Amino acid sequence: MFRAVGSALKRNKEAFNGIARGFTTSSHRVFTSNITAASVTSASSSPLAGNSFYGLRSLLKGQNASMFRRMSTVASISSESKEGLKLLVTGGPQAQKWVGIWLFGSAAWVFSMVVLGGVTRLTRSGLSMTDWKFTGEFPPLSDEAWAKEFEKYKQSPEYKRVNKGMNLEDFKFIYWMEYAHRMWGRGLGIMFALPFSYFLRKGYITLRLGVQLSGLFALGAGQGFIGWWMVKSGLEEPPSEYSQPRVSPYRLAAHLTSAFAIYCGLFWTALSVVMPEPPAESLAWVRGAAKVKKLALPVSLIVGITAISGAFVAGNDAGRAFNTFPKMGDTWIPDNIFEMKPLLRNFFENTATVQLDHRLLATTTLIAIGTMWWFTRKLDIHPAVKALIGSTVGMTAVQVTLGVSTLLSYVPVSLGSAHQAGALTLLTLMLLLNHTLRRPSPSLLKSLPQVAKSNFS
């Protein structure tokens, strides 16, 4: 027990020194939580907890080393305590740091996968590869191999109805786009599995974390099957009401929603590894965070639903219809929004209804996040929470602007991709906000004063 306490005290000292260095060397705003001697009655009988949160500006600047040092939460708890914090990673601060870097890197890889998938769709490259192999395949490397692949594509409905007359060079472009998307996904599997195996062998991964990561890995492996299931729907002859082949909007929504779920799971888990405790300086701030959380949870749900509705806009190519704003053509609400039977189909397959839904949901998201900011602006809460709420409001405004610009300019690849990336960025901010609003552990709560004593710079 004494060895554990001594080790914990050493880790606390290192964390405090790192925070002190950050105050003198960083030009960015840093939010830290300091535990003074008055907060700790005895090193052997009371839990010691220190936590810090690096400001959003520094996060966006990409100062990874500083971020992990300042976001690390160090908890020193007696082995006999039943209220101790259960860490996801064993092996000390360095193990936490490297596991956190790996998980944040994996989340960033998934983010890039989502953006690359959007570019692949917007360049109409997704149906260029007419088969799929689980183990992967080499691209065509000879003229004969390219000719063979091109002939296979010529048998597809997309070539016959949309790209008839396409030359080989144009085909190579869309083929390479789809191939890159598939290989980037397989690369993610390797990038995730190898460090996972290493950390397991080192004994850093707890059972709880291992189960979580195994579930995410299984979901990621399933993404390949979902992706091919989606592409396969676009290789079939389209129904008569479609003028050109396209993948099923339901399958596209399933593919994108699964990708979002994997990203959110990885990002949340990474935060939990490097920041086991939320930033907390006082009981007043904890109570304020609880009030914000009551608003943040439903707002997060609205953000998620709006993002998924965007998948149906993409699946129905609805962004290339009604390219006016705020009206949809000459009217506020098109006449044909309920023309399909049964009625429910309109919300997922009717171009006019799908776009109207997305407009309404986007407006609701903007109002909801603005309302959250309004009702929390005078609350006594941690500065990190205030910064995140303000950043979320700003990102929402940017995302709405991107959406309207994409619509008015008839969905160019650049704006369409930026809009999709913006949706994931907004989800990221909501995840970060909700993670920061978690209730501290009982051991940390016991050590907190009623009112914050720390100074923030």
Swiss-Prot record:
Compartment(s) where it occurs, according to its Swiss-Prot or TrEMBL record: Mitochondrion inner membrane
Catalytic activity entry: Fe(II)-heme o + 2 A + H2O = Fe(II)-heme a + 2 AH2
Mitochondrial intermembrane domain ranges by topology: 120-186, 232-255, 316-357, 409-412
Top EC group: oxidoreductase
Cofactor(s), by name: heme b
The protein's annotated pathway: Porphyrin-containing compound metabolism; heme A biosynthesis; heme A from heme O: step 1/1
One Pfam family, short name: COX15-CtaA
InterPro entries: COX15/CtaA_fam, HemeA_Synthase_type2
Gene Ontology biological process terms, A to Z: heme A biosynthetic process
Catalytic activity, EC: 1.17.99.9
GO terms under cellular component: mitochondrial inner membrane; mitochondrion
Single GO MF descriptor: oxidoreductase activity, acting on NAD(P)H, heme protein as acceptor
UniProt keyword terms in alphabetical order: Heme biosynthesis, Iron, Membrane, Metal-binding, Mitochondrion, Mitochondrion inner membrane, Oxidoreductase, Transmembrane, Transmembrane helix
Disulfide topology: none
Binding site for heme b: H358, H419
Ligase recorded as keyword: no
Signal peptide residue numbers: none
Xref: PANTHER family: CYTOCHROME C OXIDASE ASSEMBLY PROTEIN COX15, CYTOCHROME C OXIDASE ASSEMBLY PROTEIN COX15 HOMOLOG
Assigned protein family: Belongs to the COX15/CtaA family. Type 2 subfamily.
Role of this protein: Catalyzes the second reaction in the biosynthesis of heme A, a prosthetic group of mitochondrial cytochrome c oxidase (CcO). Heme A is synthesized from heme B by two sequential enzymatic reactions catalyzed by heme O synthase (HOS) and heme A synthase (HAS). HAS catalyzes the conversion of heme O to heme A by two successive hydroxylations of the methyl group at C8, in a reaction that involves matrix ferredoxin and ferredoxin reductase.
Name under which the protein is recorded: Heme A synthase COX15
